[in-house]
Amino acid sequence: MRKLPVCVLMIPLLLAGCGGAGSKAEETALEIRSACMSASACTGSAEITADYGQRVYRYQMDFQAGQKETVLTLTGPDTVAGVVARLTNEGESLLEYDGAVLETGPLNEDGLTPVSAIPAVLNAARQGYLETCTLEEREGREELRMLIRDPEQPLGQGLESSLWFDTQTQSLLRAELCQDGFCVIQCQFSQFTMEQEETQVK
């Protein structure tokens, strides 16, 4: 008998708030979430904008997110290009390279920073509670928008993540992380790929 991984069995629960049963948006979200959960690694490039209210930071980086750690290589701006961070599941906000230190500080009480944004986005895609999922048209392309949030918080409160995926390629296109209704992180992704593990069915 084939045994399904627990993570696969949990998918319907994590889609509980997503549209009507059997809708195209729900089916697409199920397929994309399943791919995210079964991926052994995600790679790509991202442009991160972090809004601290009085300060706005912009970074460009390449990333490789595995099951145990995420490796980020900053490519811009020039003052921090070449900085490399290795983040565990707990995440870090301190980067060191040749004695230089970059510390931007947390954006919320949970310690969200520009450095931890990519792990936070991928974690939301894999296992966050899906409040809604809708299909949108943008520049002639069909996209799936996922709104992921804490179901115990009122709408617009706490951390809410909006993720957009290309429905054809399942590539992550962009993301917005909002804290109490204020957008603190924006991510624009390119060359996003998910590497799938090869499994044998007995």
Show where each model-derived region lies.
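Sec-dependent bacterial lipoprotein signal peptides
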Residues: 1-16
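N-terminal leader/targeting segments and the immediate start of mature chains
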Residues: 17-64, 68, 198-202
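Hydrophobic lipid-interacting interfaces of membrane-associated proteins
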Residues: 49-51, 77-79, 100, 180-182
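Short solvent-exposed loop/turn micro-motifs enriched in small/polar/acidic residues
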Residues: 54-56, 78-80, 127-129, 156-158
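One face of beta-strands
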Residues: 40-48, 55-74, 83, 93, ...
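Gly/Pro-enriched, hydrophobic low-complexity segments
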Residues: 131-202
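An acidic-aromatic
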Residues: 64-119
